[in-house]
UniProtKB/Swiss-Prot annotation:
This is Transmembrane protein B169L. It is a multi-pass membrane protein. Belongs to the asfivirus B169L family. It is found in: Host membrane; Virion. Glycans are attached at N88. The keyword Transmembrane applies. The keyword Metal-binding does not apply. Keywords: Glycoprotein, Host membrane, Membrane, Transmembrane, Transmembrane helix, Virion. Its main location: host cell. The chain crosses the membrane at residues 28-48, 60-80. GO terms for cellular component: host cell membrane; membrane; virion component.
Length: 167
């Protein structure tokens, strides 16, 4: 897991639950995950094990609540501490590597790498013009392309209906 993934989880938890009265309790996404887990368990037990009589109903409810509380504690403490450890280690790795990269040779600071120029990228992405009388671009794989002879471009109407212009 990386820092961006954990930060994304935290941001998602904050964005979904932004109601003022519940903001403090639902700010942690792990609490939200635990509540969702509890709801899923309640629905699962209600569907798979419907109580028949009062004794069984009470016993099932007690077992259900014990399971939910145990899972809540398990999820919250285990996952939260593990992810906090991972988050702290990732932060330290990032800090140490950035300091190491900046100061490799003592006080010497390595300049940042400049991005490639935009004009070169645009020229490569731009479609190439096909001159009149040249072969189609799709047929270039059959044999090597001959040097293109520059001919003046012919108007489209003349290509379609040459008889009108020849008269």
């Amino acid at each position: 897991m990386n820092v961006d993934f954990i930060a994304g989880i935290n941001n998602l938890g904050e964005k979904i639950y932004t109601c003022e009265p519940f903001k403090t309790s639902f700010q942690n996404p792990f609490i939200v995950a635990l509540i969702i887990t509890a709801v899923v368990l309640v629905v699962f037990f209600a569907i798979c094990n419907p109580p028949v009589d009062k004794k069984r109903k009470t016993k099932t409810a007690i077992y259900l609540y014990i399971c939910i509380v145990a899972l809540l504690f398990l999820h919250y403490y285990v996952l939260n501490h593990q992810l906090n450890d991972i988050y702290n280690k990732s932060n330290m790795d990032v800090i140490v590597s950035s300091i190491h990269d900046k100061y490799k040779g003592g006080d010497e600071i390595i300049p940042p790498v400049s991005p490639p120029s935009i004009s070169n990228e645009l020229e490569e992405d731009r479609p190439k013009k096909i001159l009149a009388g040249s072969k189609l671009a799709g047929l270039a794989d059959s044999k090597p392309a001959e040097p293109a002879v520059s001919k003046p471009l012919v108007p489209l109407q003349e290509v379609i209906m040459p008889s009108q212009y020849n008269n």
